[in-house]
Amino acid sequence: KMKEGGLPYNYSELADELLAVSHRPYGTGFYYGDARQSPDVDGYTAECRHAATVEACEPAGEGAFRVIARCYNRFCEGDELEALSPGPHIPLVRVRNLAWLPAPDGDDAQPKRVPVAVANRSAERYAFETGEELAPGDFLRMRINVER
């Protein structure tokens, strides 16, 4: 298979992505006696957590970009997030100047951004600055420690 530009895919680069998917540990199920799906681990295994999805990105000065993203799992000021994008490979993205963007309501039609240290409101919008240009739809994730 070829990717854009006629270059062959390097499948070894994609191999780690298979391990990053959240799933229950594999087991023998009913094959050997009582059914046990995951005797050693309770719950799912994952090496990455979906932190946010990019909704917009615009220039914010020389070498800086302002990102608007919808939060799915907690991330913090200073965290380094991995960006998964159908476009060019993007290195780690460091979160700077994190702010919560409250939704308008009956009391405040144009609420001001609120500087925060932690993005912890699931499905809410946040803004931050970074040195990398992102695109709407880019998936931001963070690596987590998983014992196996």
Regions found by a protein language model. Give the residues of each.
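Surface-exposed amphipathic alpha-helical tracts and adjacent flexible/coil segments at the periphery
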Residues: 1-148
